[in-house]
Every structure is written in structure tokens, then in C-alpha cells.
Amino acid sequence: SAPVFADLDGDGDFDLLVGNHEGSIDYWENKGNSEIADFVYNPTQFIGVAGGRNSVPAVLDLNGDGRNDLLTGNLIGQLRKFVRIEQGNGFYFRLERRKYLNLDIGIGSVPKITDLNNDQQPDLIIGSDSGNIISFQPDPEKPGILSWKPSLEYFKQLNLPIGGNPEFVDLDTDGDLDLIVGSEEGTLY
């Protein structure tokens, strides 16, 4: 399972998405609030969303419309891009790119969205089962729809374990992000 919290329905609280081994994404809408969550399973928005085996979701507004879209990593090392489409009082996700960024990171892509360099812009970090981590940052030469360019300075010196699943948090409260990597064997680095 690959859980991620994000405000998908725009109501100001975090909903829960879980990618799974079969390739689907499960959605639990938070019917509570930001202080007391009440997660209710809601499959409607994700009918037809197939991220590929071992789906790992990441959420971000990719097309500049103010609504969160969806990236999914999968077993074969690719990313799929789904855009959010409004329909009546609800929404659904439509596949826009099967091989987003023409990327093949190797077995098991794990996308994460974070701001690595404190520039108030989202960076895309992708881990893989092979232990590789690559990163992309927004391309300032292409305003409007979010476009990425490789960011080569990060992670090139790291020798990571098989099944590298990166997570970023300020563990030591010094104002910058620290990297934690989960491995296939269950160890944290």
C-alpha cells in the first residue's frame, strides 16, 4: 500500500489516497474537518483510474487550473498523469499521459512532491526499487502549465537500498528537509 494525504475535494482538509498492488487507487474522502478526520470510502472519482501494478499516487496541480491532479508511479518504472475533470457536483480523473516525462526509472517508480530548495516551487522526486532517486524542478522557461526539467545536483552521490521509497521531513527542526528512505527489507535510512 502507498498512502498519501491531500485535499482532493477542495474543502480544506486532507483526504486519503492509497495506491495498491493491483494498480488501482482507493479514495477515502474526509467528511470531518482538519482537526477531526472522518474518512469515508468513495470509489466514484477513481473508477477507471489505473496507475499500473504497484500504484503509488502523488497529488499536485499539474495544469495550472487550481485543482489537484494525480501522478502515479508503477511497477514498470513509469509515471502516469491524470487530470482532474469537474462534472456536476463532483469530479473524476482522466488519463492524459501514459508515460509522463517519457520516464523509465527502472522497476518501481515512487513519485513524491516537495520543495527541496525552499524556492516555494514544487519539486518532483522519484525513487525506485533499484535504489535510484532522480529529481525534477519546475522549468521557469515554460510558464503556465507545470513543466519539469531534470535537477541533477540532488541525490547523485547517494547509494540507496533496493526498494528506495523517499520521504522528506524536517526531522531536526533546522528549517530544511531531511531525507528518509524506506527499503524493501523494511529498514529506514
Q: At which residue positions do the language-model features occur?
A:
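Blade-edge motifs of beta-propeller repeat domains
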Residues: E29-G52, V83-G106, Q137-I162
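Hydrophobic beta-strand segments that make up the repeating blades of beta-propeller
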Residues: L16-N20, L70-N74, L124-S128, L179-S183
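Short, intrinsically disordered, charge-balanced linker/junction segments flanking boundaries
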Residues: D174-L177, G182, G186-Y189
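Calcium-coordinating acidic loop motifs
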Residues: D7-D13, K31, D61-R67, D115-N117, ...
